[in-house]
Amino acid sequence: LNGIVFISQALDYQGSTPYVRDNLISFITYVPTMAATALYHGRVEPAPESQAVFLQQAREFAINEYLPALFKGNTIDREEYLAVRNRLSYFTGLSTNYVDRANLRVQGNRFTKELLRDEGITVGRLDSRYTEEVVDQLKGSHFRVLNVASDADFAELRRAKQETYS
């Protein structure tokens, strides 16, 4: 064993997973990653002057505005809801319509499908720089994606297969 590579924030599974019922913290922890992904794919408008400043603003928004809004639940007033929705839409690159439908609760697995939906592609879950065409699971051909697999590894396997069988 030469080392260990940790994938995701699974070191604090209880605190970071959206699969624990009513875990509001999970939505907060994903905002900076979603913001970086949206910025990388050119979905943040207007585009910020600095990536570092933008990501710091996303972190501050998540803690200072988004978290309190989620804790308020259905007692949040309309003005605050709209302000948070608009900022969340800006940082994530998602439409305000989608953020409304999600009731301000954008899950990571849905984000990967929604960000580039208009282009017919999904974003990698383990490395969001990679993309893949959306697979229709009803067609039965979804095994090639496997959560856009281990994105870089999957791309490498395709390259190696071409070299081997060419």
Locations of regions flagged by a protein language model:
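Alpha/beta-hydrolase fold catalytic core
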Residues: 73-166
